[in-house]
Amino acid sequence: QHARDILLSGADKVAINTGAVKNPKIITELMELFGRQCIVVAVDVKRNYNVAGQKNVFTGNGKKFWFEVFIYGGKKETGIDAIEWTKKMESLGAGEILLTSIDMDGTKDGYDIDLTREIVNSVSIPVVASGGCGKPEDMIDVFKKTDVEAALAASIFHYETHSVNRVKELIKENGIPVRI
């Protein structure tokens, strides 16, 4: 109901995370009412090194892991594989994925390129990368190494380390399309 009210109030899009996990059919219901382009599924993901079970397993730094979906602002694990989840959300009507790496969020060490690449390659809807941007080069890196549609950054702007305009100029200088 809350998402419906937000869209009826004039918002272009609404992002849903915990609500989608608890009631996945809400994605289809909202999509049918407002259109796919309005429905963003926010997916908070953390690497899980307990690889028991049927998960998409990856190896990094000599360790095996899978990408697990978290809810309640990244505080509660779900046991849901992020790759399978994003595919399901697309099939239910999501128009976009807002992908946040819990592991990288707040570190200012760059985006989780492996996670972003895997999610982008598993869906055909736009993916927005989030979590970890500490400098303009991190944004350039995620655009060049993945087919991500957009990149979200907070810390570099909150602490006025870089201006939005300067970051956009640097992105454009690196051959990445951006609105100036």
Residue ranges and their predicted role:
Residues 3, 24-28, 83-87, 113-117, ...:
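Generic structural signal for well-ordered alpha-helices
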Residues 26-45, 108-135, 174-176:
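Alpha-helix-loop-beta-strand connector modules within alpha/beta enzyme cores
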Residues 103-105, 133-136, 157-158:
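Short Gly/Pro-enriched loop/turn and capping motifs at secondary-structure junctions
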Residues 1-10, 49, 114-151:
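Catalytic cores of alpha/beta
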Residues 16-17, 72, 129-130, 153-154:
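Thr-Gly-centered strand-to-loop micro-motif
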Residues 5-8, 28-30, 54-58, 111-114, ...:
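Short, glycine/charged-enriched secondary-structure capping and boundary segments
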Residues 26-34, 140-180:
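C-terminal helical cap(s) of enzyme catalytic domains, especially alpha/beta-barrels
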Residues 7-99, 103-104, 175:
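Conserved anion-binding
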